[in-house]
């Protein structure tokens, strides 16, 4: 007789500790994706999605690297299941990118003159006015702020 594969995923130890927060962030993400963007600019419609993605990734990053409350197995499981952005977390581990808001802000192909986003400029080098990033709505994610 052939083996029957079940669709159930085996969750590592400690999953029950982080599952409520991740499910809450997942439901917020669904609301943000289905939210109508009437009266807003096209780019502003994606800002809540970028913000929630940042929150999910930062939550798992803090649990594993800063507070050391989850195991490596659980951390890798969450990354493999798509609960956090693996590339964004990889950037956070590098010096100068500890507070990076999203990956689009450091891609030079999306900006004029092949530079990074305006939110990557430290506050002491900016003018008096408050500037929001066009991609994600960030007001400043430079490490020196």
UniProtKB/Swiss-Prot annotation:
The protein's UniProt keywords, in alphabetical order, are: Nucleus
Gene Ontology annotations for the cellular component aspect, listed alphabetically: spliceosomal complex
The subcellular localization recorded is:
Nucleus
Q: Which domain of life is it from?
A: Eukaryota
Q: Name the InterPro entries for this protein.
A: BUD31 (IPR001748), BUD31/G10-rel_CS (IPR018230)
Gene Ontology annotations of biological process type: mRNA splicing, via spliceosome
User: Which family would the database say this protein is a member of?
Assistant: Belongs to the BUD31 (G10) family.
* The name this protein goes by in its record: Protein BUD31 homolog 3
Q: Which organism is it from?
A: Oryza sativa subsp. japonica
């Amino acid at each position: 007789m052939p083996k029957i594969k079940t669709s159930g995923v085996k969750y590592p130890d400690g999953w029950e500790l982080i599952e409520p927060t991740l499910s809450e962030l997942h439901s917020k993400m669904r609301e943000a994706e289905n939210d109508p963007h009437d009266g807003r600019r096209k780019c502003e419609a994606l800002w809540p999605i970028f913000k929630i993605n940042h929150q999910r990734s930062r939550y798992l990053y803090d649990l594993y690297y800063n507070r050391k409350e989850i195991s490596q197995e659980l951390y890798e499981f969450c990354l493999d299941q798509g609960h956090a952005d693996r590339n964004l977390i990889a950037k956070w581990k590098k010096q100068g990118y500890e507070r990076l808001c999203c990956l689009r802000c450091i891609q030079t192909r999306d900006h004029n003159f092949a530079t990074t986003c305006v939110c990557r400029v430290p506050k002491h080098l900016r003018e008096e006015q408050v500037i929001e990033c066009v991609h994600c709505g960030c007001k400043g994610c430079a490490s020196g702020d």
